[in-house]
């Protein structure tokens, strides 16, 4: 009888131990590997200036509790903090040169390693702009046992972009963007969230925009083709209302890319009504 009780006690201890391990794994699903949770997002947002990246990225960030990595903001932040990469980048920029791909990849990696927000994933905005950059990004992520899930392209006609950008308003601190016609703030020239003043960028004029668009199209076509071949490229009609574009993004995240790419023309009606 005593031997039977001992066996039952040992069996109970084993079951308790297994139960504890199961609970621990449920609490930490990524233990023992680099795989992500179901809610983690890893994506790049492709689109010309004025396509709506600054409108949609904060919504994605809020939904997934992830970080929004805009290369320009990253560079300015690293330079301001005088990090080793920031000092190296500043030296190059002061000499009128272009910051190397290795430095930008290094900055992205540092953000992924140290930015708490990046634990929920990331949105890359403004990078990669070339196929070699895309390949370097893939290699860096592969070394972390990660890979991109989505390369979303916000597609829009150049003529509509001119109308959009010449009325664009920006909140400098957050990057939130508005438009006098398409997406006006609740109070004129005032950020909805902070109440701080909005600005209009000096390069948001038709002539400057045409040059930026020419550069964008020549650079981006090969990158889009690269991600199309990998199977993660998804197009969205960015001429639609911001709310409709957001629904298209949600469809992509839910796996319905066909529905996400459907056309809509609500924004064109606003354009005509505004007399632009």
UniProtKB/Swiss-Prot annotation:
In this chain, the stretch annotated as LID covers 167-204
Q: What is known of its domains?
A: Consists of three domains, a large central CORE domain and two small peripheral domains, NMPbind and LID, which undergo movements during catalysis. The LID domain closes over the site of phosphoryl transfer upon ATP binding. Assembling and dissambling the active center during each catalytic cycle provides an effective means to prevent ATP hydrolysis.
At the top of the EC hierarchy, this enzyme's class is: transferase
Where is ATP bound in this sequence? 50-55, 168, 177-178, 240
* A Pfam cross-reference name: ADK
Reactions this protein catalyses: AMP + ATP = 2 ADP
The main location class comes to cytoplasm
- Residue span of the signal peptide, if any? none
GO biological process terms on file = ADP biosynthetic process; AMP metabolic process; ATP metabolic process; DNA replication initiation; pre-replicative complex assembly
Q: Which Gene3D superfamilies match?
A: P-loop containing nucleotide triphosphate hydrolases
What protein family is recorded? Belongs to the adenylate kinase family. AK2 subfamily.
Q: How does it assemble?
A: Monomer.
Q: List, alphabetically, the HAMAP family matched.
A: Adenylate_kinase_Adk (MF_00235), Adenylate_kinase_AK2 (MF_03168)
Q: Quick check: keyword Cytoplasm in the entry?
A: yes
Instruction: Return the EC number.
Output: 2.7.4.3
Q: Where does AMP bind?
A: 71, 76, 97-99, 126-129, 133, 201, 212
Q: Looking at the record, which segments are called NMP?
A: 70-99
The keyword Cytoplasm is annotated on this UniProt entry: yes
Return one GO MF term.
DNA replication origin binding
Q: Which PROSITE patterns match?
A: ADENYLATE_KINASE
Alphabetical list of InterPro entries matching this protein: Adenyl_kin_sub (IPR006259), Adenylat/UMP-CMP_kin (IPR000850), Adenylat_kinase_CS (IPR033690), Adenylate_kinase_lid-dom (IPR007862), AK2 (IPR028587), P-loop_NTPase (IPR027417)
Q: Which UniProt keywords apply?
A: ATP-binding, Cytoplasm, Kinase, Mitochondrion, Nucleotide-binding, Transferase
Q: Where in the cell is it found?
A: Cytoplasm, Cytosol; Mitochondrion intermembrane space
Q: What is this protein called?
A: Adenylate kinase
A GO CC term assigned to this protein in UniProt: cytosol
Q: What does this protein do?
A: Catalyzes the reversible transfer of the terminal phosphate group between ATP and AMP. Plays an important role in cellular energy homeostasis and in adenine nucleotide metabolism. Adenylate kinase activity is critical for regulation of the phosphate utilization and the AMP de novo biosynthesis pathways.
